[in-house]
Amino acid sequence: MKQISGRDFCKLLEEREWVLKRISGSHHVYAKIGYRERIVIPIHGNKPLKLGLLKAQMKIAEITEDQL
C-alpha cells in the first residue's frame, strides 16, 4: 500500500467533501453529513500515517487504494 502523509490525506478528504470540524493539538477532526463517524488525522510534519490507521480511516471515508 502506498504511504501518504497526514496533510495529503486531509487534502484527499476535503476533495471528497469531508469538512474540518476542529483541530486538537496536532490532530485534525473531519466530519461529513450522513456519516456518524469522525475521522481524526494526526498531522506530524510530512511523516507518513501508520498503515493500520490509514486503512481504518480509508474504510470510514470509503476510499480505495486506487484513489490514493
Spans of features found by a protein language model:
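Histidine-centered active-site/metal-ligand motif
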Residues: 27-28, 44
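C-terminal structural segments of small proteins and small subunits
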Residues: 45-68
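Intrinsic low-complexity/disordered segments
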Residues: 24-25, 41
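Alpha-helix initiation/capping motif
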Residues: 2, 42, 46-47
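Active-site beta-strand termini and strand-to-loop segments that position acidic
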Residues: 30-34
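Short, charged/polar, Gly/Pro-enriched secondary-structure boundary elements
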Residues: 36-39
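N-terminal first-folded block
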Residues: 1-24
